[in-house]
């Protein structure tokens, strides 16, 4: 997904620069589908020798109308209107409708997980398909092993450069994709003249006829191959916030025409050569003159790399959103560029690299990868349709319109899903297993948070103000820090997590001039940055609610610096004069952040399922990042404390003092 978030005022505008940005960011996946989609369709029919005119016309017609109904109607005309403060994607859509039904978190988790799983296979199939074009260059192509090695080298380079950001090469994405789509359109138009009867495919009759025709050897399951042409449609919606609605509205017609011309050109070539026997045919490269193949392989490889980069960046964004929505554990996130939205997650990058490389080694050829492709993304689209239905209800769309749109989309996408199920035994089970693993982690993380919130005990801080005030003046204790800051996940007005007061008063009394209690609330809006302060009628207790959008960095110290300045300037917080400082006139004291981690106690009192969830979460936490880096505390003084998560009053265990017994025989002997 993209690297540039457009200003609100330009969201609905289209510009030439925005047009190029959209080409480079949004359409990589769907724009490289001509590399392999028609190849999969022909292979499913048993090869070029088994193709008839009606089959070719029907297949191209299915392609055209799939692009029209799924990409144009669902995503461009409907989904793009479901923006969350100009942001798109399945998690942005979920935040719009999650208050309507609690169970809507289920399609959000399933859709997000399958989209992530699909993101691991897309780079493998696109780059492999591009490199396989060398089969037509006999003096260069040696064998499939060479293709695999070349693909692995390209993918390794692509994943290795992620830590440096993509801003430098990203500027080339738009112009390269403009050349790519221009080539698709021009070459497709030229090849269409091989047999102009291919234009009949615009008529949907041929698409419907093919589904029920005895000439269609794959039958209904041909839809599994047809769906490959629109797998990138979900990315179009996900990148809404990075390019703007206006630029997508203007660029999609250009992209769609070029893609359709490419498929028509391939179809016309198939019509002109039907009945021939050609081994391992890929119509995309077969239509080219021999002296052009090497150049097109280079161009298609660049397009495949750009498509892969978009999927990788999109995976980073998707994971970061899931973390902020408490659907995934914390991972270390870096921001290698200066542009908003540009991020890098090492753990996700490594997982994608390993998984993508595994797919290349396991499937070996693009033909085998295609057989496993698209099942996961059909599930994502069905989940998006579910959430879209509730969005339309929320917006007050007429019921008849909702029924037509929802039933129509469920029928179409349900058909593609059913047709793709046959791919399960052809390798799609691996992608499904990856998606299930992600769903499992999401479920554990989300459910465990709810369980902990249920058991956490809260105390009224008003009842402890006198103790805190006495402690801050009690010179028998060393000054722990001028300002002590506690991050808490549960704070409701004057009620605060018991473990925090336990840490201040019981574990080791922490004398400070000011006690801060900070709670970060993730808002449904993507780029909110607001705060609310309650001094609790004191000048030494500060309750801070930080309201941050689900795409904002949660760097607490940087926000606190602004809040402290605001409070001191307004007179609500006394200035903390520093006698020793390299900063003349410094009025703010030192800070120590205390991160309290609660450890499960007396777990046997908990129901078995809840105990399993919390214990599983504890195991997952061992391999994930700590809150220190997530909250931007790595350059601050931090103390991490472990306190018990008490489910109920701990029952004292019975025990009796053992009294010394005097041996009777020994007692008699002494007398």
From Swiss-Prot:
Gene Ontology MF terms: potassium ion transmembrane transporter activity; symporter activity
Primary site of residence: membrane
Residue ranges of the TM segments: 18-38, 60-80, 103-123, 146-166, 173-193, 218-238, 252-272, 292-312, 343-363, 373-393, 402-422, 424-444
Cysteines paired by S-S bonds: none
Membrane topology (UniProt): Multi-pass membrane protein
UniProt cross-references to Pfam families, sorted A to Z: K_trans, K_trans_C
Compartments where located: Cell membrane
InterPro entries: K+_transporter, K_trans_C, K_trans_N, Kup
Keywords: Cell membrane, Ion transport, Membrane, Potassium, Potassium transport, Symport, Transmembrane, Transmembrane helix, Transport
GO cellular component assignments: plasma membrane
Catalytic activity: K(+)(in) + H(+)(in) = K(+)(out) + H(+)(out)
Highest taxon in the source lineage: Bacteria
HAMAP family assigned: Kup (MF_01522)
PANTHER family found in the cross-reference section: K+ POTASSIUM TRANSPORTER (PTHR30540:SF83), OSMOTIC STRESS POTASSIUM TRANSPORTER (PTHR30540)
Protein task: Transport of potassium into the cell. Likely operates as a K(+):H(+) symporter.
Family according to the record: Belongs to the HAK/KUP transporter (TC 2.A.72) family.
UniProt name for this protein: Probable potassium transport system protein Kup 2
């Amino acid at each position: 997904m993209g690297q540039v978030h457009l200003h609100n005022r330009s969201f609905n505008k289209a510009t030439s620069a925005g047009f190029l940005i959209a080409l480079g960011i949004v359409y990589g996946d769907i724009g490289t589908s001509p590399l392999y989609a028609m190849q999969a369709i022909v292979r499913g029919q048993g090869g070029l020798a088994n193709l008839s005119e009606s089959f070719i016309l029907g297949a191209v017609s299915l392609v055209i109308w799939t692009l029209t109904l799924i990409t144009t109607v669902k995503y461009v005309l409907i989904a793009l209107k479901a923006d969350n403060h100009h942001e798109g994607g399945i998690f942005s859509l979920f935040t719009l409708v999650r208050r309507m039904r609690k169970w809507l978190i289920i399609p959000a988790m399933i859709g997000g997980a399958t989209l992530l799983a699909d993101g691991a296979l897309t780079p493998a199939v696109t780059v492999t398909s591009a490199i396989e074009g060398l089969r037509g260059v006999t003096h260069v192509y040696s064998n499939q092993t060479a293709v695999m090695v070349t693909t692995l080298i390209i993918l390794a380079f692509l994943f290795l450069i992620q830590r440096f950001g993509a801003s430098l090469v990203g500027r080339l994405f738009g112009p390269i994709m403009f050349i790519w789509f221009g080539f698709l359109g021009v070459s497709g138009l030229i090849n269409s003249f091989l047999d102009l009867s291919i234009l009949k495919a615009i008529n949907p009759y041929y698409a419907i006829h093919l589904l029920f025709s005895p000439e269609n050897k794959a039958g209904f399951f041909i839809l599994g191959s047809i769906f490959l042409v629109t797998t990138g449609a979900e990315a179009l919606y996900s990148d809404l916030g990075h390019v703007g609605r206006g630029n997508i509205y203007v660029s999609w017609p250009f992209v769609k025409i070029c893609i359709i011309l490419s498929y028509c050109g391939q179809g016309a070539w198939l019509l002109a050569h039907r009945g021939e026997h050609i081994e391992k045919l890929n119509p995309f490269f077969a239509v080219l003159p021999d002296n052009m193949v090497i150049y097109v392989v280079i161009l298609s490889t660049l397009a495949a790399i750009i498509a892969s980069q978009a999927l990788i960046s999109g995976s980073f964004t998707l994971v970061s959103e899931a973390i902020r929505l408490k659907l995934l554990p914390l991972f270390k996130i870096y921001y290698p560029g200066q542009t908003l939205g540009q991020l890098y997650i090492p753990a996700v990058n490594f997982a994608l690299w390993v998984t993508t490389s595994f797919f290349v080694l396991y499937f070996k050829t693009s033909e085998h990868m295609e057989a496993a492709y698209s099942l996961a993304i059909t599930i994502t689209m069905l989940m998006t349709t579910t959430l879209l239905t509730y969005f339309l209800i929320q917006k007050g769309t007429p019921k008849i319109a909702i029924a037509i749109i929802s039933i129509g989309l469920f029928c179409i996408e349900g058909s593609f899903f059913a047709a793709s199920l046959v791919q399960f035994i052809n390798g799609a089970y691996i992608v499904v297993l990856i998606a299930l693993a992600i769903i499992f982690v999401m479920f554990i993380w989300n459910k465990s948070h709810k369980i902990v919130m249920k058991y956490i005990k809260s105390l009224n801080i008003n009842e402890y103000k006198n103790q805190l005030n006495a402690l801050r003046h009690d010179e028998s204790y060393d000054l722990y820090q001028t300002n002590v800051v506690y991050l808490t996940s549960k704070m409701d007005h004057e009620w605060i997590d018991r473990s925090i007061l336990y840490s201040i008063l019981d574990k080791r009394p922490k004398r400070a001039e000011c006690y801060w209690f900070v709670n970060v609330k993730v808002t449904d809006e993507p780029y909110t940055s607001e705060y609310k302060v309650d001094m609790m009628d004191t000048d030494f207790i500060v309750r801070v609610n930080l309201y941050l959008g689900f795409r904002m960095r949660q760097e607490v110290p940087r926000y606190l610096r602004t809040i402290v300045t605001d409070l001191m300037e307004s007179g609500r917080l006394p200035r903390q004069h520093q006698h020793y400082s390299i900063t003349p006139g410094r009025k703010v004291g030192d800070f120590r952040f205390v991160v309290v981690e609660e450890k499960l106690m007396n777990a046997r009192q908990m129901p078995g399922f809840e105990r399993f969830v919390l214990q599983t979460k504890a195991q997952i936490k061992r391999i994930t990042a700590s809150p220190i880096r997530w909250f931007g505390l790595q350059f601050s003084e931090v103390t991490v404390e472990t306190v018990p998560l008490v489910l109920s009053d701990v029952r004292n265990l019975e025990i009796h003092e053992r009294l010394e017994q005097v041996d009777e025989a020994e007692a008699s002997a002494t007398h």
